[in-house]
Amino acid sequence: MTQQFWGPCLFSLFMAVLAQETLDPQKSKVDCNKGVAGTVYEYGANTLDGGEYVQFQQYAGKHILFVNVASFCGLTATYPELNTLQEELRPFNVSVLGFPCNQFGKQEPGKNSEILLGLKYVRPGGGFVPNFQLFEKGDVNGDNEQKVFSFLKSSCPPTSELLGSPEHLFWDPMKVHDIRWNFEKFLVGPDGAPVMRWFHQTPVRVVQSDIMEYLNQTRTQ
């Protein structure tokens, strides 16, 4: 009786786990397309205080990590981790660039002038100051998306088959290559071409490990 009962149960459990792995709708990381026309050096953005327009050409020869950020997201704790990544990878010519966006759950509601104060005193709080460049708040999806994100998204496959619940997403039209949520990341190589794209929930330590593995591979080629 016991063996007759457990046999089908174990088989069902095995099939459920197998199905879950097979139908996993997301990947922690995807490689970007090879031979994409153009580079990020054709684009630029205004710094968060609006005081300077930065042409991304000035990062030529470096690796750039583009991140869309938000101050009131469950992933806002990622900010200190990005500080650590920037500090530890700076010797390897890696620069983190942050782009505040309010299109995901309306989680970046403040003005540009309020964002740094919110980070310092509210979330993450505790006097936090980002050690990487932040740019003006803007769209990363939809009709008014920043052109650099149009380029990045067209250069890399999406990390997830699912776009998310429409009631929490604020742009139109919605496209398959769109960014899914706050804190998605794109790595651009020293030639200005996109290299990798990470799912927003991929831990920063994994992102850092992936970058280091990539840097080690490029040194040996």
UniProtKB/Swiss-Prot annotation:
GO terms for cellular component: extracellular region. The active site is at residue 73. Its EC number is 1.11.1.9. GO terms for biological process: response to oxidative stress. Expressed in the Bowman glands. It comes from the Eukaryota. Keywords: Oxidoreductase, Peroxidase, Secreted, Signal. Its main location: secreted. Residues 1-19 form the signal peptide. InterPro entries: Glutathione_peroxidase, GPX_AS, GPX_CS, Thioredoxin-like_sf. PANTHER family: GLUTATHIONE PEROXIDASE, GLUTATHIONE PEROXIDASE 6. Belongs to the glutathione peroxidase family. This is Glutathione peroxidase 6. It comes from Rattus norvegicus. The lineage of its organism: Eukaryota, Metazoa, Chordata, Craniata, Vertebrata. The gene is Gpx6.
